[in-house]
């Protein structure tokens, strides 16, 4: 773990818990390292003219995987516009773009040691849930309301 963090100079493990927290200097945030200062001109293909066809099997698969009801025209239109947007950004050239781990790469961020400070509060945490089953939260599946 330490070897991984040593490559990322912006991560530093706090060795003392009583160190005074340093505030970020927002004046230094005006020149991020990897974010370009000027927009990059790029030609995007016009995908709005082509009509996107989605067959019934694909819609049923998406409904099952995402637990979202796509029966309404509004939901189907949102899905189609999302596909058109994905088509546009798929053509962006990212060959020489280095990965951006955080926008604060020039700031050293303090990390605390990975130690349990409080624990054994399962009952207290589960009291926050409306519905539980044994020791688990029960959440509604997607946009379908949970019946009480």
From Swiss-Prot:
It catalyses: L-glutamyl-tRNA(Gln) + L-glutamine + ATP + H2O = L-glutaminyl-tRNA(Gln) + L-glutamate + ADP + phosphate + H(+). Pfam families: GatC. One of its GO terms (molecular function) is ATP binding. It is found in: Mitochondrion. Coiled coil: none annotated. Transmembrane segments: none annotated. The keyword Signal does not apply. It is an enzyme of class 6 (ligase). Keywords: ATP-binding, Ligase, Mitochondrion, Nucleotide-binding, Protein biosynthesis. InterPro entries: Asp/Glu-ADT_sf_sub_c (IPR036113), GatC (IPR003837). GO terms for biological process: glutaminyl-tRNAGln biosynthesis via transamidation; mitochondrial translation; regulation of translational fidelity. It comes from the Eukaryota. The keyword Amino-acid biosynthesis does not apply. Belongs to the GatC family. Subunit of the heterotrimeric GatCAB amidotransferase (AdT) complex, composed of A, B and C subunits. Allows the formation of correctly charged Gln-tRNA(Gln) through the transamidation of misacylated Glu-tRNA(Gln) in the mitochondria. The reaction takes place in the presence of glutamine and ATP through an activated gamma-phospho-Glu-tRNA(Gln). This is Glutamyl-tRNA(Gln) amidotransferase subunit C, mitochondrial. It comes from Drosophila simulans.
């Amino acid at each position: 773990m330490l070897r991984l963090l040593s490559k990322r100079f912006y991560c530093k493990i706090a060795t003392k818990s009583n160190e005074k927290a340093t505030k970020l200097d927002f004046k230094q945030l005006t020149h991020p390292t990897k974010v370009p200062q000027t927009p990059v001109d790029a030609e995007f293909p016009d995908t709005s003219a082509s009509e996107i066809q989605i067959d019934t099997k694909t819609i049923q698969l998406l409904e099952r995987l995402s637990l979202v009801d796509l029966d309404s025209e509004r939901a189907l239109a949102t899905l189609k516009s999302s596909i058109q947007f994905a088509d546009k950004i798929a053509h962006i050239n990212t060959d020489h773009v280095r990965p951006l781990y955080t926008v604060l790469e020039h700031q050293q961020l303090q990390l605390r040691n990975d130690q349990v400070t409080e624990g054994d509060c399962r009952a207290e945490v589960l009291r926050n849930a409306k519905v539980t089953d044994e020791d688990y939260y029960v959440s509604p599946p997607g946009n379908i309301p949970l019946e009480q």
